[in-house]
């Protein structure tokens, strides 16, 4: 669901953080690594991650310069530092950062920070989604937070976690102990629409939050789980009665 860029010139540190931290537990499903600020800036501009973890002292472009370059972006930052420059960094950097961590990184401490961050991100995402959904009739079925059926809630949660992938109904119900026919029937009874319909509406809803972030429309289609742009465009028109381009013009 979320993305992180880990930037450190020491390979053992950046790869260690990538491999040791259970990122999936904190809803981070895409982890990028960079060996300096130049690589990190390119990744950040391309993928717009929710979190950047960066060292301060690196070749080519250091962490301070990187922070200056991304100050206008909406991303959270965790700074890594050695003992020698830790106090200087806290006093001298004027950017708002999520937290500072001394090397060697305390993985337990990092996970505490991630836990706090993901709660904030999920709440922001939920609020944004509810705000957008309330403005369009097509998204009304997505507004309900919880249903009185365990299996339906499990399927909805799975959709929200995996909508960005080329997921199928079988994929969505593989972790619950019921047949596909029972799951589909129960979902329709409680939600009023099919699982596939809910998935596609949710994908289009999420796409609205990306349309003003300077992505190409085919990039947005891929980011919200559509294998082809024409399928994204078809469902967009189906639910909103206009094309993505017309929606952007109307929103200006």
From Swiss-Prot:
InterPro entries: CheY-like_superfamily, Homeodomain-like_sf, HptR, HTH_AraC, Sig_transdc_resp-reg_receiver
Cellular component, GO annotation: cytoplasm
Post-translational modification note: Phosphorylated by HptS.
Pfam families, alphabetized: HTH_18 (PF12833), Response_reg (PF00072)
Keyword terms: Cytoplasm, DNA-binding, Phosphoprotein, Transcription, Transcription regulation, Two-component regulatory system
Biological role stated in the UniProt entry: Member of the two-component regulatory system HptS/HptR that regulates genes involved in hexose phosphate transport system in response to changes in extracellular phosphate sources. Activates uhpT expression to facilitate glucose-6-phosphate/G6P utilization by directly binding to its promoter. Antagonizes CcpA-dependent transcription of a subset of CcpA-regulated genes involved in antibiotic susceptibility.
HTH araC/xylS-type domain: residues covered: 153-250
Modified residues (4-aspartylphosphate): 55
Major localization listed first in the record, in broad terms: cytoplasm
Name of protein: Transcriptional regulatory protein HptR
PANTHER family to which the protein is assigned, alphabetical: HISTIDINE KINASE-RELATED (PTHR42713), TRANSCRIPTIONAL REGULATORY PROTEIN HPTR (PTHR42713:SF3)
Domain named Response regulatory: residues: 3-118
Knocked-out gene: effects: Deletion leads to impaired growth when the available carbon source is limited to glucose-6-phosphate. Deletion also alters antibiotic susceptibility.
Transmembrane regions listed in the UniProt entry: none
GO molecular function: DNA-binding transcription factor activity; sequence-specific DNA binding
Gene Ontology biological process terms in this record: phosphorelay signal transduction system
DNA-binding region: 170-191, 217-240
Cell compartment(s), UniProt: Cytoplasm
Keyword DNA-binding: yes
């Amino acid at each position: 669901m979320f993305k992180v860029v880990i930037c450190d010139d020491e390979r053992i540190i950046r790869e260690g953080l990538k491999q040791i931290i259970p990122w999936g537990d904190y809803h981070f499903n895409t982890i990028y690594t960079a060996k300096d600020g130049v690589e990190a800036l390119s990744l950040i501009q391309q993928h717009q991650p929710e979190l950047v973890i960066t060292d301060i002292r690196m070749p080519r472009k250091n962490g301070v310069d990187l922070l200056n370059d991304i100050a206008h972006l909406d991303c959270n930052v965790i700074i890594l530092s050695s003992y020698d420059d830790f106090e200087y960094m806290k006093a001298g950097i004027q950017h708002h950062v999520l937290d500072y961590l001394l090397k060697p990184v305390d993985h337990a401490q990092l996970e505490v920070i991630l836990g706090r961050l993901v709660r904030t991100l999920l709440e922001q995402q939920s609020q944004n989604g509810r705000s957008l959904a309330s403005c369009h009739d097509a998204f009304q079925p997505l507004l309900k937070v919880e249903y009185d059926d365990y299996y339906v809630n499990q399927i909805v949660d799975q959709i929200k976690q995996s909508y960005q992938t080329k997921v199928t109904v079988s994929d969505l119900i593989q972790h619950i102990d019921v047949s596909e026919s029972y799951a589909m029937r129960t979902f329709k009874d409680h939600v009023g629409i099919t699982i596939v319909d809910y998935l596609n509406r949710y994908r289009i809803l999420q796409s609205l939050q990306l349309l003003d972030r300077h992505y190409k429309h085919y990039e947005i289609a891929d980011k919200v789980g559509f294998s082809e742009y024409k399928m994204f465009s078809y469902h967009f028109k189906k639910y909103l009665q206009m094309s993505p381009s017309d929606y952007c013009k109307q929103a200006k």
